[in-house]
């Protein structure tokens, strides 16, 4: 991983962050990522619609600043087959007006519907080449232990207590993605869904015997589309025309 002064993207990231701040989006951290020319910028949480607006604005700013510096930004999920892919980790929090801890039910709801949602979170064949390596999840699981999980629970409390969904990639439509996550979480609350036991293992090093105990995300885009087409949850959450467009 490049570090200053060898990190050639440092000045570009700084320019992106300053531009975002001028547009009312608050960057929280930026750094070189694991792959060559790969960079990460995290920005502050917001209510769902604002968060989706921020995600779209972010992509526009990155593309514009990159072009201004003679570069091209690539948000595709797997730009280089033998290198880490690009993810769009979604951090989400939910609070009850009564003070009850509803996060376990929200996470359980998302886990129960994630396979049906995947066609909308990972929309290209290359999306599925990313799963299962370089910190990208393959198994439907949660834990606070490591980054091989589908849902990671960061060590944070108070307003920063959250769940991090690690499967989506940056070319998904954030409005659709957030809609599905909200409906899945609400379904978990409505059903009082029970959160399965945490998977406190590293799936990248675990034995096949251990990994076989867990369900996986769809292996291909065709598998993901097939799951979405027959899903009552998807049919009840999105307009029919949207479902048909993403599953054709």
Q: How would you describe each model-predicted region?
A:
Residues 1-248:
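Glycine-rich, acidic/polar active-site loops that bind/position phosphate-bearing ligands
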């Amino acid at each position: 991983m490049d570090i200053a002064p060898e990190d050639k993207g440092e000045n570009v990231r700084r320019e992106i962050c300053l531009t975002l701040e001028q547009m009312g989006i608050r960057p929280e951290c930026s750094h070189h990522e694991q792959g060559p020319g790969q960079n990460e910028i995290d920005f502050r949480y917001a209510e769902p619609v604002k968060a989706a607006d921020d995600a779209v604005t972010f992509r526009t700013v990155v593309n514009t600043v990159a072009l201004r510096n003679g570069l091209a930004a690539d948000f595709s999920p797997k730009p280089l087959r033998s290198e880490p892919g690009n993810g769009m980790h979604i951090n989400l929090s939910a609070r009850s007006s009564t003070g009850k801890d509803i996060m376990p039910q929200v996470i359980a709801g998302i886990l129960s519907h994630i396979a049906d949602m995947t066609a909308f979170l990972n929309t290209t064949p290359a999306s599925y080449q990313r799963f299962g390596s370089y910190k990208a999840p393959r198994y439907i699981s949660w834990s606070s232990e490591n980054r091989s999980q589908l849902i990671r629970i960061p060590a944070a409390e108070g307003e920063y207590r959250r769940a991090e969904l690690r499967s989506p990639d940056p070319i998904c439509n954030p409005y659709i993605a957030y809609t599905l996550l909200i409906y899945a979480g609400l379904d978990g609350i409505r059903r009082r869904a029970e959160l399965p036991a945490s998977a406190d293992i590293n799936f990248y090093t675990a034995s096949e015997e251990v990994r076989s105990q867990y369900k996986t995300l769809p292996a291909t885009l065709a598998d993901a589309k097939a799951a979405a087409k027959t899903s009552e949850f998807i049919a009840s959450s999105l307009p029919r025309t949207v479902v048909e467009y993403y599953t054709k």
